[in-house]
Amino acid sequence: MSDYIVVKCGGSMLDQLNDVFFDCIKKLQQKYKVVIVHGGGPEIDAKLKDCNIKVEKRDGLRVTPREVMDIVQMVLCGSTNKKLVMNLQKHNLLAVGCSGCDGNLLQVQPVSKEIGYVGEVSYVETALLKGLINMNYIPVIAPIGINENEIYNINADNAAAGIAAALSAKELIFITDVDGILHEGKLVKKTDEFEIDTFIEKGVITGGMIPKVQAALASLKMGVQKVSVVNGTKDFAEVTGECIGTTVTKGVNIV
């Protein structure tokens, strides 16, 4: 069984992370080898508005022409990545920040010409991640990738799923500001790919949770053992290394 865990933290969560989150990362690190992938959407939006550049998304993906890609790269690889690295180290968690173009870490296939420099993960150079982890660092990855010497923006959920699949990770953890997937106000503690599809069809899962569960299902199909959706502002990791939230597994129909 793989002992890797990938933690995905969206850009909207980065400013909400508190001591509890970092304590949970410490608990996970005692049991597993941890990789963190982050987003940066709100800061990118703010910087684009400062530059009088239109913020545009299609099907949940940021339309990324060259001038937008330059700002995406600046934010994700610069201030956002380094802020998270410094916060980890402030809590005595040694971390190294890098992007998917460093060491050819994340190679991508372009999604479509219509949305510009946006790619989906096609290959992960896991040797770089494993090398950093073996030196007791937590890799902190900005979701930028490369294709034919061009830099591409990657949806952070897709980047995390791709990395988790390449590592055959034990678990992919999505950090959110809710306790997990909720149905009629109650937490769904365990679910699977069949029930997830039903939840989407019935409108139980909406908005920003949809790309997360879609990435979760994709990573399960690629070999990740389970996916958890947790509240990053609460204690989501037990001392056993198990997560408190919604756990999604493959092919166990519990409906």
Swiss-Prot record:
Q: What class of enzyme is it?
A: transferase
Top-rank taxon, per record:
Bacteria
EC number(s) reported in the record: 2.7.2.8
* Cited Pfam families: AA_kinase
Any one Gene Ontology molecular-function term assigned to this protein's record: acetylglutamate kinase activity
The answer to whether UniProt assigns keyword Transferase to this entry is: yes
Q: Keywords assigned by UniProt?
A: Amino-acid biosynthesis, Arginine biosynthesis, ATP-binding, Cytoplasm, Kinase, Nucleotide-binding, Transferase
Gene3D superfamilies xref list: Acetylglutamate kinase-like (3.40.1160.10)
Q: Name one GO cellular component term.
A: cytoplasm
Kindly list the places in or outside the cell where this protein is found, as annotated in its UniProt entry: Cytoplasm
Which GO biological-process labels does this protein carry? arginine biosynthetic process via ornithine; L-arginine biosynthetic process
Query: Where does it primarily localize?
Result: cytoplasm
Pathway(s) it belongs to: Amino-acid biosynthesis; L-arginine biosynthesis; N(2)-acetyl-L-ornithine from L-glutamate: step 2/4
Q: Which family is it part of?
A: Belongs to the acetylglutamate kinase family. ArgB subfamily.
Q: What does this protein do?
A: Catalyzes the ATP-dependent phosphorylation of N-acetyl-L-glutamate.
PANTHER family in the cross-refs: N-ACETYLGLUTAMATE SYNTHASE, N-ACETYLGLUTAMATE SYNTHASE, MITOCHONDRIAL
Query: Per its record, how is this protein called by name?
Result: Acetylglutamate kinase
